Amino acid sequence: MEWSLTQNKLLAFHRLMRTDKPIGALLLLWPTLWALWVATPGVPQLWILAVFVAGVWLMRAAGCVVNDYADRKFDGHVKRTANRPLPSGAVTEKEARTLFVVLVALSFLLVLTLNTMTILLSIAALALAWVYPFMKRYTHLPQVVLGAAFGWSIPMAFAAVSESVPLSCWLMFLANILWAVAYDTQYAMVDRDDDLKIGIKSTAILFGRHDKLIIGILQIAVLALMALIGWLNGLGWGYYWSVLVAGALFVYQQKLIVGREREACFKAFMNNNYVGLVLFLGLAMSYVG
């Protein structure tokens, strides 16, 4: 009986950390890898790469825990989230807080093996991860904070490799914020009706009937910034082909969301994993060439 209870609790923690849904971790991982490859340039040191890959998964899990903790009073009123561990009672509030602290502590232990500049930047990463889930109560732009949280690994990666945060770093950071606003608006379009009922704010609500147009403008800006980064770093034509492929994926996403159906919007959101992957492959091949 004790093993059954323990097993159920571990499964609940597993769901709370979203380890069964890796899309969020992947959307956090790709910009991190972009930054490491550009900052090096090429293949980064194995230990630095390992620290950032592990840190991505740990902090994404921590972000999911604090997000569900912040939304625990709302999730029970939304069909898609009603069965999450906190509103369903599978995990207590105290257990969620403890799990968050453990995940953050493990992440910080990894960062302590890097240089001082990276350690100091990690404090801001923690603040962004904690603040983001609460922003949707006060502003229609929580996706901007999400983009900053998901992109803060970019200056950390540059700092870890070169102890500097050059122009390319901040252009990539900006590109990631715009990308995150675009894809998380697609995600928010799935829950727009429910969010309106319970008073949750989002860019999907703010943009209203202009949502598709604004997403398109953001996507074009992302492509322009990534092309500029390629030019500043002297990357080869293979990289620019990857930017074009990413653009084709954005066009496909626009076709998906044209009718604003929930499943299609979610599919468009998920497709962004391929955008991140394609851009990383373009970077990697450019440095190999």
Swiss-Prot record:
Pathway it works in: Cofactor biosynthesis; ubiquinone biosynthesis
Alphabetical list of PROSITE patterns matching this protein: UBIA
Main location: membrane
Cellular component aspect of the GO annotation: plasma membrane
Residues spanning the membrane: 23-43, 46-66, 99-119, 141-161, 163-183, 213-233, 234-254, 268-288
Keywords, in A-Z order: Cell inner membrane, Cell membrane, Magnesium, Membrane, Transferase, Transmembrane, Transmembrane helix, Ubiquinone biosynthesis
Catalytic activity line of the entry: all-trans-octaprenyl diphosphate + 4-hydroxybenzoate = 4-hydroxy-3-(all-trans-octaprenyl)benzoate + diphosphate
InterPro entries reported for this sequence: HB_polyprenyltransferase-like, Prenyltransferase, UbiA_prenyltransferase, UbiA_prenylTrfase_CS, UbiA_sf
Single GO molecular function: 4-hydroxybenzoate polyprenyltransferase activity
Pfam families, A to Z: UbiA
Name of the top EC class for this enzyme: transferase
Location of the protein in the cell: Cell inner membrane
Needed cofactors: Mg(2+)
NCBIfam families: ubiA_proteo
Function: Catalyzes the prenylation of para-hydroxybenzoate (PHB) with an all-trans polyprenyl group. Mediates the second step in the final reaction sequence of ubiquinone-8 (UQ-8) biosynthesis, which is the condensation of the polyisoprenoid side chain with PHB, generating the first membrane-bound Q intermediate 3-octaprenyl-4-hydroxybenzoate.
Name of this chain's protein: 4-hydroxybenzoate octaprenyltransferase
